[in-house]
C-alpha cells in the first residue's frame, strides 16, 4: 500500500513538471506568434537614430571634416543593412559645393548698371519722331528746355483737342483748308514749284468750308486755326458726305430761285434733317383715274352712333389684289372712359362668306387710336369686286375676366370704296 502511494505521488510530480514545461513552451509560442502582429508599434527600444547632415564645407576640407566626424550609428546600420547599394560618386560633393558657391556669390553680388545718356536721348528724344518734328515747328505748341540744352514738347497736344496735331496722313487738308492756303499756293507757283499735289485736295475745300462755316474774317494764323492741324482719317468720308449734301442743297436753292424768281428767308435756311430731304425729293402721287390702272379712295366710315374709322382703299386690277390702309379711329371713347381700360382693335373681312378674316394690332391707352396698317385681299377679279362688300368691326378687347365690347360695325360695298372702278 505504501509503495502504491509513493508511485502515485511520483506520477503527480512528473505530470506537474511536464505541465509547467508545456505552459512555458506555449507562452513562448504565443509570444512568437503575436510578435509579428505588433511589429509596427513604436517602442523605446525600436526608436532609430536620426542623423542631420551638416552644411557642405567649401573646398577640399570636406573629406577631412567627414573623417573627423566619423560614421554615426545610423550610417553603420544602413551600411550593414544594404551592402549591395552602389557607392556615391566622389565627384558629386565637389559639384554640389561649386553650385552652392555660385549661388552665394549671386546672392551677395551688387549689380550696378550704367546707361549712357546718349542712348537715352536717342530713344526718348523729340527729334526721333517725324510727327513730333512737325509739332515742334508749330509756335503755338508749348515747349520746354531739358537739362542737356535740347527743346522738347512740354505736354502732349492729344489732351487738349480732339483733332490731333500728330496725324500727318491727310496733311494736304490742312494746307487746303487753312485761310492762308491760297497765298502759299500763289507763292509756290511764283517760285516755280509744282502745286499739283496741293491742288489735289482742292475738291475737299467746299466740305471744309461747309463744316466750319467758311473762311474766317478774323486775322487768326494758320497754326492757331483748327484747319492748321490735319483731320483724322475718318473725316475724309465725312467731308465727302458733307460735300454731296451741300451740292444737293445748292441745286435745290437754284431750282427754287429759278422757279420763284426770288429767295425767301425760309428758303435760304433749308432744313438739314433727313426727313426734309425726303420731303424735298418726294414726288406728288398721281391722281387716281381710269387711265392710271389703279383705283383708290380715302373714306371716313361711321361704325357707330358717334365713332368713325378712316381708311384708304386701293385696287390693283393687274394683280387682282385689294389693299385697305387703316389710318385711325375717332370718336369711339368719351372723356369719362378710363384710358387704362382702352384696348382698341379693328377686324376686317369680305362678305358674304366672311372671307379672308384679318385683324389689326391692339392699341392701348388711347382715345384716338392710330393704326397705319395695310390689309391685303388677294384673288379678287373685277367681277368679284363688284359683288363683295367689306365688313369693318371695331372691338374693345377685354381683360382676362371681361368680355370684348363691340364699339361699332359696318358693311360697305367695294364699289362704294372704289369710285373709279
From Swiss-Prot:
Q: Where is the C2 domain?
A: 305-421
Q: Where is this region: Disordered?
A: 13-97, 119-140, 158-228, 250-303
Q: Which domain of life is it from?
A: Eukaryota
Modified residue Phosphoserine is at which positions? 262, 264, 273
Please list the residue ranges that the record marks as compositionally biased, kind Polar residues: 215-228
> Does the record carry Phosphoprotein as a key word?
yes
Gene Ontology cellular component annotations, sorted alphabetically: cytosol
Q: Give the similarity note.
A: Belongs to the C2CD4 family.
* Descriptive protein name: C2 calcium-dependent domain-containing protein 4C
The root-end lineage is: Eukaryota, Metazoa, Chordata, Craniata, Vertebrata
The encoding gene = C2CD4C
